[in-house]
């Protein structure tokens, strides 16, 4: 069965060798064409879980294209014929834009191509794909405005926006134990225990579920702290105490989130994926359990990135890390250049957006890297996430080039130069010099073996070389070879 498909309601097709009750090995519920199904041992990568499904296709899984079209037409007809149009131009503009977006979302949810996930429902992931398109178009619109117009345009979204942010004091007293404060000497620690602590933990837990690799998560976590150190001269909120960077963030929040995420991945890898239709389950307890498991994956794939296996995979993993770090930095820089308070709901909505699209994008990237086909296309969600990250960066560059061009401190630039040189040196050695050296050694070894084989061939010919006697060959071998036997 083709990757990314699931058996339809009819169960196994007559042409398929799949045993009854077995489903495809991937998540979406779209049925394949005849003859495309394969058994659990066929067409499945070693990192993919085995799935058993009774093939039930209920009303819940159908596309409902005509139903959505009918409801949409009735709604537009009601607004057009029965509702009086207000005379407020600004209100009508907002309502027209929102209605246009909703119509596009209705079209996308019913007609867009399914992605790699199907739980809780394929329409859910199609919805976020369409939201990605809308968000990218919104960013493009902001990018083509002047700095002042772009900031003031956000007033149409929230009248409280478009106002310069007040300056805040970051960093400050970094003593873990403050002897001058007799009432509470640990007040600096308690001040840091705000709502961002559980947010950091939850964020890294979800990122671990996206990336599915401990090393990549730790590298991104540590590198972002280095970026905060490096850019605190540009953004004041990057200025934190050393223990806030390495103890609170890396070890406690990020580390604990990554640990819990890896434990969840371990459970998902070992879990048995056996699905039944809700009405095929006899007990109420089983039905409730089936409803709860609807919000878990249909199947599971372990990610084996193997960055050192080839130059292509190494560059791809480096690109993934770069996009992750840029998306993290864009969160802070966009708030700064667009004058958004950290607690504004738009900031939270952006994080919710990336949580929903990030997992699909990572799966599409992994399939793109892992597929042996040379001309496979990158998935649409991964393409949009990369485009959104790049567009956000361009907005930051356009809206506040002065902040971005503030020169790095000398010791910071030296550290990044040294790190870049080491990474480049390792890349050249691992994928060029090392391969050349190995090929040279292999060529020498093959030449030496060929010479040795030629010498053995001459030695086993009709006439033995000088100095070869029967003590080496033995009498039987000597007679068989035509050598003179002793008297």
Curated annotation (Swiss-Prot):
Glycosylation (residues): 181
Q: Care to name a GO molecular-function term for this sequence?
A: transferase activity
The pH response of activity is noted as: Optimum pH is around 7.5.
Phosphoserine modification sites are: 16, 24
Q: Which residues lie on this side of the membrane: Cytoplasmic?
A: 1-62, 118-126, 335, 398-403
Keyword flag Ion transport: no
Give GO cellular component annotations, separated by semicolons.
endoplasmic reticulum membrane; membrane
What subcellular compartments does it reside in? Answer: Endoplasmic reticulum membrane
Membrane topology field: Multi-pass membrane protein
The pathway that the record names for this protein is: Phospholipid metabolism; phosphatidylserine biosynthesis
Name the Pfam families on file. PSS
| EC primary class | transferase
Q: Where is the composition biased (Basic and acidic residues)?
A: 1-10
Q: How is this chain's activity regulated?
A: Requires calcium ions. Inhibited by exogenous phosphatidylserine.
What UniProt keywords apply to this chain's record, in alphabetical order? Endoplasmic reticulum, Glycoprotein, Lipid biosynthesis, Lipid metabolism, Membrane, Phospholipid biosynthesis, Phospholipid metabolism, Phosphoprotein, Transferase, Transmembrane, Transmembrane helix
Q: Which residues lie on this side of the membrane: Lumenal?
A: 84-96, 148-313, 357-376, 425-487
Residues bearing PTM Phosphothreonine: 485
Q: Which PANTHER family does this entry report, sorted A to Z?
A: PHOSPHATIDYLINOSITOL SYNTHASE, PHOSPHATIDYLSERINE SYNTHASE 2
User: What is the stated purpose of this protein?
Assistant: Catalyzes a base-exchange reaction in which the polar head group of phosphatidylethanolamine (PE) or phosphatidylcholine (PC) is replaced by L-serine. Catalyzes the conversion of phosphatatidylethanolamine and does not act on phosphatidylcholine. Can utilize both phosphatidylethanolamine (PE) plasmalogen and diacyl PE as substrate and the latter is six times better utilized, indicating the importance of an ester linkage at the sn-1 position.
Similarity comment text for this entry: Belongs to the phosphatidyl serine synthase family.
Protein's name according to its UniProt entry: Phosphatidylserine synthase 2
Q: Organism, per UniProt?
A: Homo sapiens
